[in-house]
Amino acid sequence: LCLSSAVHDLLLENPDAKISVNTPFVEVFRFYRLSGICKESGQVTITWDHYRQAVEQAKESPQHVTEFFHDVLANLTGLPCSKRTLRPVIHSAANERVNPFAENKYWVVFAGGKSDIPLKLWYGPYFQQVADYLHSCGRLVVQTGRSKDRHYHLRQSIKIFDDNYKPSNIRRLFQIIKYAEGVICPITSGMHIAAAFDKPCVVIGGGREDPWWEAYNSDYGAFGGHYSGVPHKYLNTVGTDMPCCRLSGCWNRQFQNIETEGCDNFAKTVEFPGQIAHCMLAIDPSSVIAAIDSYIR
């Protein structure tokens, strides 16, 4: 998703260049002016080494992940790629320009996550309180997300949502978010799709990732200090007294146990996966509700 902003600007600035994208997420690039598969001699590859190096550099000179993709594409291709569009770009077909929930106001909630990075998960009962509040404001609450491949949803344990919508493909998810009033999620695709459609988004970020790298707003020094879209409310604990994220995100993937290193600052919970990071637990429902109010009041 974040790569799309750089590909969009690369195409704008180099209209005569033959550009293709080799990615598992081809639906993101539907309706782009792309060529077919490039010959191997003309391919460039963005690697995890590029990503990790940029994350470290951003701690000294804050930049957003979309800025990184512009820089790395310009460096690898040798083509100019000015930072014109620093949020994902998704083009919609005519049949996708319809509100899937008629005229109802609704918020999309990603309550759950992936088992391979459980540190991103927020506390289920907190989602309950936020959903109750949205209902009291006359809003529908729509949960969405995948239901396989290490993904799971809190709907399995608590029934808090008007609709537990599992889109058949990511294009349908784009449509749902495009017509939503806003999105509530941890750090996941939902926040990037919300940015693409310039939608309000409350991100429960915790302390795992650096806010300047993830947040679509001007609060952390990225975007040259000026983000042009609807600013997201990025709730996080980086820079607080928590020792694990006092200066920057920890970037751990798993909780520490006898077999693996990882986050050791967590609480036990009866919900899957059995632990919740204290940096996520520190973000309480009142903070999320206040962020929602800043958009709807």
Name the predicted role of every residue range:
Residues 49, 111-112, 187:
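Glycine-rich, N-terminal phosphate-binding loop of Rossmann-like dinucleotide-binding domains
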Residues 37-41, 164-165, 233-239:
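Short acidic-hydrophobic, aromatic-tinged amphipathic segments that line or gate anion-handling sites
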Residues 1-5, 121-212:
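Donor-binding and catalytic core of enzymes assembling or modifying cell-surface/extracellular glycoconjugates
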Residues 25-38, 151-159, 214-220:
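Short, aromatic/basic amphipathic alpha-helical patches
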Residues 1-68, 172-175, 182, 191, ...:
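Active-site and donor-binding regions of nucleotide-sugar-utilizing enzymes
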Residues 24, 195-296:
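Nucleotide-sugar donor-binding patch of glycosyltransferase catalytic domains
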Residues 24, 111-113, 144-147:
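Short, well-ordered beta-to-alpha junction loops that form the rim of enzyme active sites
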Residues 53-124:
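Mid-sequence helix-capping/hinge segment at a functional interface
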